[in-house]
C-alpha cells in the first residue's frame, strides 16, 4: 500500500488485491514479509512494480530462486503482460526462459554484440540445417551430397544426415529425390534446432 500511494494509484485496494491474487499471494496478505520465502518476495516485488500499470517494465532475473511451479507461474504472468501490449525488458541468465518469452534477444559481452529474434539469431550463427533420418546412412552419401550446388555442409551421424542448405524449403524435395534415386530409405525429415545457449556461446566465442 505504501508503494501504491507513492505511485499515486487511485484504486489502491483494488490494485493490491488484483496483483496479489494474480501472483498467488492473496492468502498471505496479512503476513509480514519476514515470513516470506525468497520466491514469495520475488513475486511480491513484481506485484509492487505493477501497481501503477506501467507500459514499460524492467524485470531483473524474475524467476531467480523460484521453484519450478512458481517459475512457471511468473513466466505465464509475463506472457500475459506481453499480450496486453506492455514492453518488457527482461534481464536473465536463463536462456531457455529468454527463448520462451522474448521477441528479441540482446547478447552482451562488455558491449551489445547482437539484437534479433531467437530464430534469426539461430539462422545467422548456424544457418538452417536439416536432419534426414535414414534406415541406413553411409559416409559415401556425404561425398555425393557435397557435389550438389545448393549443399553447403553435410555430415553423417549414425543413421542421420545433417545437411546445411541454401534454401531448405526449396531444396528439401531435391535432397529426398536424390536419396530415393540412390535407393536410400528416408524415414523422417526435421530441422536441427540449436538452443539459445549454443547460440550465445558461439557469439561470445568469436566476439
Predicted regions and their residues:
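Hydrophobic anchor residue at the start of the ABC signature
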Residues: 46
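Conserved catalytic motifs of ABC-family nucleotide-binding domains
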Residues: 53
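ABC transporter nucleotide-binding domain
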Residues: 75-166
Amino acid at each position: 500500500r505504501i508503494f501504491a500511494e507513492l505511485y499515486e494509484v487511485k484504486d489502491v485496494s483494488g490494485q493490491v488485491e488484483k496483483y496479489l491474487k494474480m501472483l498467488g499471494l492473496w492468502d498471505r496478505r496479512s503476513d509480514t514479509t519476514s515470513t516470506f520465502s525468497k520466491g514469495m518476495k520475488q513475486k511480491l516485488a513484481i506485484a509492487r512494480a505493477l501497481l501503477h500499470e506501467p507500459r514499460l517494465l524492467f524485470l531483473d532475473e524474475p524467476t531467480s530462486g523460484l521453484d519450478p511451479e512458481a517459475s512457471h507461474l511468473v513466466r505465464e504472468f509475463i506472457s500475459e503482460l506481453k499480450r496486453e501490449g506492455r514492453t518488457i525488458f527482461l534481464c536473465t541468465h536463463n536462456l531457455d526462459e529468454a527463448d520462451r518469452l522474448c521477441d528479441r534477444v540482446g547478447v552482451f559481452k562488455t558491449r551489445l554484440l547482437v539484437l534479433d529474434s531467437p530464430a534469426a539469431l539461430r539462422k545467422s550463427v548456424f544457418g538452417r540445417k536439416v536432419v534426414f533420418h535414414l534406415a541406413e546412412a553411409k559416409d559415401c552419401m556425404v561425398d555425393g551430397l557435397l557435389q550438389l550446388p545448393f549443399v553447403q555442409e553435410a555430415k553423417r551421424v549414425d543413421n542421420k544426415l545433417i545437411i546445411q542448405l541454401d534454401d531448405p524449403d526449396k531444396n528439401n524435395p531435391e535432397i529426398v529425390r536424390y536419396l530415393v534415386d540412390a535407393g536410400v530409405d528416408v524415414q523422417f525429415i526435421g530441422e536441427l534446432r540449436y538452443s539459445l545457449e549454443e547460440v550465445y556461446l558461439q557469439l561470445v566465442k568469436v566476439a
